Amino acid sequence: HQPRRQRQMCIRDSTKPQGSLGRVEDFAIWMAGWQKKINPTMDNTHCLIYAGNHGVATQGVSAYPSDVTAQMVENFKRGGAAINQICKLANIQLSVIPIDLEYPTRDFSKEAAMGLEETIAAMQLGFDSVNQDCDLLLLGEMGISNTTAATAIACALFKQPVEAWTGIGTGLDEKRLANKISVIKSAIELHGQNFKSPESILATLGGRELAAIVGSIIAARLLRIPVLLDGFICTSAAATLTIFDNKILDHCL
C-alpha cells in the first residue's frame, strides 16, 4: 500500500484546493495502488472488445437480428466505430475478438445458454488475451441481445425485480420491452437464482463474450492490472465474481 499512500500525500501536498480535481484524484490513487508506482502510467493501455451471439435473440428481445454482431465486428476492424476514434486519440491498443459468432449460445429462456466446458473455454480465452505488460485494461463487448443476458444475470445475482433492471437496449418499443421482461422472467423462473459459482451463472444465463470478460478480469487481478469496465453489460458479467468475494473487483472501475 506504500505507493498508494505516497500518491495520496503527493496529491494532498500539491498547490491546489483540497479535492479540487474530484474523482481524478481518486483515480490516480487507485492506479498507484494497483501498479505499485508512486507515479502511475498509462503508456501501454489495452482495450479488449469481445463479441458473441445469443440464442435468446430468437425471442425478439432486440431491435436488430443477430447478424448485426458480425457487421459491427467488421466495422470495428475497419476503424469505423466510436471506440476506434477514442483508442486512436488516447494511443490505446485495440483488439476486437469475436467468439464463435456462427454458433450462437442456446436460448436460455428454454435451457442453459452454454455447457460448463464451453463457458470455461471462453473464460480461458479472455484470461489468455490479457498482455502482462499492460498497465491499464479497458474491457468492452458487442453482442445482439446481450443486454437481455446481462439483465438476467444481474436480477438473478441481486434478487431484483426484472422490470426495474430491464432497458430498451438498442431501441425497443413498449411492446418489445414487455416481451423482453417476460423472457427474462421466464428464464429466472426456469433456472432459479441460487448460483454457487461465476461459471454456473454465466453458463446458464450468459454468453461467450461475457465469460471472456470475466476471464480477463481474473487475469488482470493476478497481474495487478487496473481495469476500466464499459457499461452495464460488462459490470453485470464482472458481478458474477462477487459470488466468491465482494472485494474481488477492487481493481475495477
Where are these regions (language model features)?
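Glycine-rich, mobile lid/loop segments that gate access to catalytic sites or pores
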Residues: 108, 113-147, 152-158, 169-176
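Single conserved hydrophobic/aromatic residue that forms the stacking wall/gate
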Residues: 1-7
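Short glycine/serine/threonine-rich phosphate/pyrophosphate-binding segments
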Residues: 57-59, 139, 144-151, 210-214, ...
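An N-cap/entry alpha-helix motif that binds or orients negatively charged groups
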Residues: 8-40
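Hydrophobic alpha-helical bundle architecture
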Residues: 215-231, 235, 239-243, 251-253
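Phosphate/pyrophosphate-binding betaalpha-module
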Residues: 137, 148-212
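A glycine- and small-aliphatic-rich helix-loop capping segment at beta-alpha/alpha-beta transitions
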Residues: 64-68, 152-163, 244-249
